[in-house]
Amino acid sequence: MERTYAEYAAHQAVELLAIDSPTGFTRQAAEWVLNAFRSLGYEARTTVKGGVLIDLGGSDENDGLLLEAHADTLGGMVAEIKGTGRLRLTALGGMRPENGEAENVRVYTRSGRVIEGTFQLCNASVHVNGEYANAKRSYDTCEVVLD
């Protein structure tokens, strides 16, 4: 069965989006993009900063087009390991705590391990916390609970 362009694009997007690529860890995503374009027959190379440059060709050198996209995702960096074992984060990029609440996260350790957890309000029990709905979401009031 022949795939349509939309199916192909969706499949490629799912594959690329499945690659963890927080700021500073974009090499694997960049390599995926590089190989994807090479498999389509395009010349692709990496830049000094780790970006991917692809020449799509064309006959008029004075009528070019540049398309740029980020391969990194917004995220957080561990600012503190609390006495409870939970993690206080600080933002990387423009990540806002209210946008990440209740999201699953992966923490990359210095030794290369990946530990999963959940980013949530420090007092996340709606049964006990009467101020849950009104609580300000910030990196001081939210934390990562490790699995």
What name fits each language-model region?
Residues M1-D147:
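N-terminal hydrophobic/helix-forming segments and targeting peptides
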